UniProtKB/Swiss-Prot annotation:
Cellular compartment(s): Cytoplasm
Organism: Psychrobacter sp. (strain PRwf-1)
Keyword Protease appears in the UniProt entry: no
Gene Ontology terms: cellular component: cytoplasm
GO molecular function terms listed in the Swiss-Prot or TrEMBL record: S-adenosylmethionine:tRNA ribosyltransferase-isomerase activity
Record region (Disordered): 1-22
Pfam family, one: Queuosine_synth
UniProt-recorded name of the protein: S-adenosylmethionine:tRNA ribosyltransferase-isomerase
Record text on subunit structure and interactions: Monomer.
Amino acid sequence: MTQPLSQDQHDSSSNMPTDNAETQGYLSVADYDYDLPDEYIARYPLAERSASRLMYLPAQKENTAVIQDRQFSDLPELLQAGDLIVFNDTKVMKARLFGQKDTGGKVEVLVERLTDDTEFTTDESGQSFDNVALCHVRASKAPKLGQRLVLGDGNIECVMIGRHENLFILSFKNPILPDLEQYGELPIPPYFERHADETDNVRYQTVFHDPTKLASVAAPTASLHFDDKVLKQLADKGINTAYVTLHVGAGTFAPVKTDNLLNHTMHSEYANLPQATADLINQTHQNGNKVIAIGTTVTRVLETAYQKTADEHGHISTWSGDTDIFIYPGFKFGVIDKLLTNFHLPKSTLLMLVSAFAGKANIEQAYEHAVAQKYRFFSYGDAMLLERNL
């Protein structure tokens, strides 16, 4: 499966909140730092997906955080019949490969995105290549143009045919996805400080992923808490579900390297909002019910679609393309009413996003509470249910 990096009919979203970028000259990244004891990082999943804890922050004004400590299994009682939950149905590729350059030096490759865009499949001489992917490459010396890499215990061959920004353009000898599934390793987050194992192959995927949408290098982690039991309880209560797609890139783990977050360049990811999901969202709001985004990836898809397609009534329609939307305090949300998410890394764009949604001071208080109460953090950690700041 290929996803275009860019096509004429596929817009890229705005990288800045349109309502506040011109009025704020400096926002300090240091304001989104916090101290976290290492032992609170969840490096392995719990025995059951829905056994996590759930911190609930009802809608409230800034700096008035009211915090409820719940269990994730309580989620159905915190929502109402007629509400709509929106999931990301992407699947994580076994995108990490290890091997050698033809010179013998060790190399690690992370496949970021498969592409059939001629911008990347044709070199400067006009020669065309098959099975092309944009990849991150780690090696003592970067591979040179035309250099061959042998990966996956000698079972995968590719050649470096170009560069695109910080990515290497590699052409593989054989179709990429089957080889990744057989010889690749699931690219679990770097803060796990370990290699992926058989447990990760199951638990770092959602139970509802679409197997045809095998294109992410990280999981939509808020969705990892859902098991069949919770999904049935939600359905039995009359809570509706819908799906969008965002193929998560390695940029989700990229640190903000500027002191002023307004100078940060957001990574771009392919996203798709189907018309059926847009219709359900519009109908839900028309009925006076709430739209709940399951994770920051869903939030980015829906708010991008709102910027691109909303009419005078706030109704959205189908949209697909690359989104580099950067959500931070001051952003005006147009679609989501509630957000289910995990606890995020210090100084991360995801922490800035939840601060925009629930209020920066409220999130600070919530994270202080989470540390004090020994919540589990990050991808395999506990969850928060946030309601939009009043």
